[in-house]
Amino acid sequence: MGSVNYRHSHCKDILLLDFLGDLRRTHMNGTLRASDAGKSAVLMGWVNKRRDHGSLLFIDLRDRSGVMQVVVNAERNVAIHEKAETLRNEYVIAAIGTVKLRDANTVNPNMPTGEVELVADDIRILNESKLPPFLPSDTALTNEETRLKYRYIDLRRDAMQFNIETRHNVAKAIRDYLSSQGFFEIETPFMTRSTPEGARDYLVPSRVQPGTFYALPQSPQMFKQILMISGFDRYFQIVRCFRDEDLRADRQPEFTQIDLEMTYPQPESVWAVVEGFLEAAFKAAGEKIETSFPRMDYDEAIRQYGIDKPDLRIPPFTDVRDCFTEQNLQELAINPNLPVIAVRTPKVGELSRKERDDIKPMFHSKGGARVYEDFKRIGSKYPDAAAAIGKKCGMEEGDLIVLVAGSAQTGPQTAMPAHRKVTPAELSIYASAGLLRLALAQKYADRHGIFKKTGDPAKDYRFLWVTNFPMFEWDEGEKQWMAAHHPFTSPHEQDMGLLEQGVDSVNDPNSTLSAVRALAYDVVLNGTELGSGSIRIHRQDIQSKIFKALGMTDEVAKKRFGFFLEALEYGTPPHGGIALGLDRIVMILAGAESLREVIPFPKTARAVDLMCDAPTPVDQKQLRELGISIKK
């Protein structure tokens, strides 16, 4: 196996590099075991580490599968030993030799390949490497900006290799499961018309149609519905989507979702499919979950958790206003017409005075809600109320209870219409209590331990279906009702009368639109929304009515959605579906803290690709061709 050399004139030491030639890799580095002893092998990869012991030189050779120790002995071949002495971290090499059992005293039980080593007969240097800004083997992480700039180095790290492999395994399991259930994988266009769905669109100018723009899809929503109109019955796609929005830890401008749609479903039909592919996905990542997820009405979630994506590992809160007498509430300056919420955090233990004082700064009031953090003081003054509260909440020794209630000064706010299930004043109490519940649980996580993995899937992965969301939500800035999910979600059949009454009152905060429920559902895991879906509108008359309820004239609706409204007139079957965030699912399974840890080439919080230095200005010639001028 002779090597063909060429000289790098820029290398002061005239480093000789080798062509691969006809050399073929025989094994992945991390796959060799004691049973392979005596075999000839050709290994290739990066130099992870080199250790010089005089006439013996040890190289840890790394590839995707793991690390293999290569031994170069000067007594066997002085020239190969001298060549190996020039190796540095991250050089790419080929090692040709024989697999040998290690001596008993050199076996490394911490390595899968720790019983064997490759005794090298030849080393080929396939490429050199500059000194990297950090090494893949570094245990202390460098700052994220440097990691993103040199992403190709960062992705060599074991943790990132694990994350991306997990992503592949999860996506494959989902694809295989949905295919087995009769779903067709069908691609939808990336270049389509702009129909904003809440966030801003990324626009693509058309050169051949000057002054016009495509938009990158925020979701394939209308296309997948049109596929149902087209007769494909069951569709799925693991698809890239784009939203021009402000970023945070769980957002990226381009992201991947598991998108599916099916005809003639009940909500339960969609849920069964989702639970099936989630079970397959978690299994592919070495985790087990229990299916038949519990279900909770949106109103129930708000009343018990103060949020529409509750973390079921944390106890719900309890309305304890009936534990107080009217005089008690008056003395405590608590509004008797609003909920009095007891937030229970388990197994916190005795708090110091300072720790109790620290609770108030954690509280974020929504619309007049107040926190009463000293339950001990309330207990000493109102022992009967405290005993009743403890019993109603299921309080145990070491539990912390904090009360959240409305201030008496805010007034009863009873002038809400009867169709409202939760008034804004009540919602302010629930939302404030919900935020405090999460903050306290996170602050004392080391004490109660409810976030630690137990090995019991029923405790570690608390899935939930949240159902019957409001169809509309009030936008205080715009002073009108907006679609809570998107305008293609079907209202409940029982609420069509409320829709009819409110269709012309888009600017009235007391409209009956507030009580219209959507056939919408979210799947939640441990307080994180994994996905959102709904049964869709399949009748053109109802779809037009929804557009009208959102303040669109017939002309505006036709301009934005005319092609879709026309498609609905050609025998559209009932249909529904869902979309789940693949990035977020992988983030949970990999135990990562950010989506950037599970996406190969992510953007920063400023939507910048540091590796490619994108976005960038473009040539004036390109702008002229597109008919675009940039205002400075």
Where do the model's predicted regions map?
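Class II aminoacyl-tRNA synthetase catalytic cores and aaRS-like
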Residues: G2-K632
